[in-house]
Regions:
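Nucleotide/phosphate-binding site architecture used for ATP/NTP-dependent chemistry
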Residues: 2-326
Length: 326
């Protein structure tokens, strides 16, 4: 993609300032709750109080907030005022607070730099989310589409960091973009893979439900063309981003030795959900949701699938079903 072709239509001074102010309000209220900052209460009228907090460089934050349950707060974005004894702050408002705290709390430059990246990614997503639908419109949406209207984790301030995505990946794969995708499939040799399921569900059962006879025949034909036997492999869906950024770079030896074989795309289309790695089938809602490992960092964790939890999942499912059926 040439830089002149980059979709930048959502970015303008007004939308950026609005997203910044909303994120700054969230940062202030969450940092108050966590006692990261301890602002002085100037006055209170009913449920609304005015607060002031000053960092070590003389940047002062004055704002209004409502006390909520469990010692939490709700800061009014439009009430926030920043003043500086030295000069007008030169950074965007959310980044200004991060810099203030990084210096006040002795945060390392590498940590501060990483957080700045997460906050900027979050701001970009927040700008894209500004033209959300009305409550009436949301009420008529099914949950697969509704997740594309959500703003992320309600308490974590850098809740859409998605470290690993470039802007092109964001436009293609972020849930708020509501871009349907098709899943790619690979064949993985049974000597390096294992299949785990409920006792009543076999691998062939899953494949026959999730893939059409036409697709299964095409996959077998692809393996046969390379003098490989379909019976020696498991078919596994993969995300395109994971394939390009993780599987090929880290498992090239397996690919070279036919232990991993790319097969192509499935026919069905999917919507990504808030977790990034979970997908809902929009072609056939009777089919399973699909959760795929994606090695991006979002809301404090990498979105992989830890093997020990994945392997034990069928047993947990069986146990919960047993409780339900009592």
């Amino acid at each position: 993609m040439k830089i002149k072709e980059t979709n930048l239509s959502v970015f303008n001074k007004q939308s950026w300032e609005k997203a910044n102010r909303q994120l700054l309000a969230k940062m202030l209220q969450e940092f108050m709750y966590e006692n990261i900052i301890e602002p002085k209460q100037l006055q209170k009228q009913g449920a609304l109080a005015t607060y002031r907090w000053e960092d070590h460089r003389g940047v002062t934050y004055t704002y209004q907030a409502k006390q909520r349950l469990f010692d939490s707060f709700s800061v009014l974005p439009e009430s926030i005022k920043l003043t500086s004894k030295a000069s007008t702050p030169t950074f965007s408002e959310a980044l200004q607070l991060l810099i203030s705290l990084s210096e006040d709390k002795g945060m390392s430059s590498s940590t501060a730099g990483h957080l700045a990246k997460e906050y900027f990614h979050t701001l970009i997503a927040d700008v894209h989310l500004q033209n959300r639908k009305s409550a009436d419109e949301l009420a008529g949406m099914d949950y697969a589409e509704l997740e594309g209207e959500m703003t992320g984790h309600p308490w974590i301030t850098y809740n859409k960091g998605r470290i690993g995505f470039g802007y092109d990946d964001y436009l293609r794969f972020a849930p708020e973009q509501k871009q349907k995708i098709k899943l790619s499939w690979i064949a993985v040799a049974k000597q390096i893979a294992s299949f785990h399921s409920l006792d009543t569900l076999g691998f062939d059962d899953v494949m026959e439900q999730e893939l059409s006879g036409k697709t299964l025949a095409e996959f077998e034909k692809e393996l046969t063309s390379q003098d490989l036997l379909a019976a020696d492999y498991y078919y596994i869906p993969v995300h395109e981003w994971q394939w390009m950024n993780v599987i090929v770079p880290l498992f090239a030896e397996y690919i070279a030795n036919d232990l991993i074989v790319p097969l192509g795309e499935g026919e069905d289309q999917y919507f990504p959900q808030q977790s990034i790695r979970t997908f809902v089938n929009t072609t056939n809602r009777d089919k399973y949701h699909v959760k795929l490992p994606m090695s991006i960092l979002n809301t404090l964790v990498y979105r992989g699938l830890p093997s020990e939890r994945t392997v034990i999942a069928p047993q947990v499912t069986q146990h919960i079903k047993g409780i339900r059926d009592r």
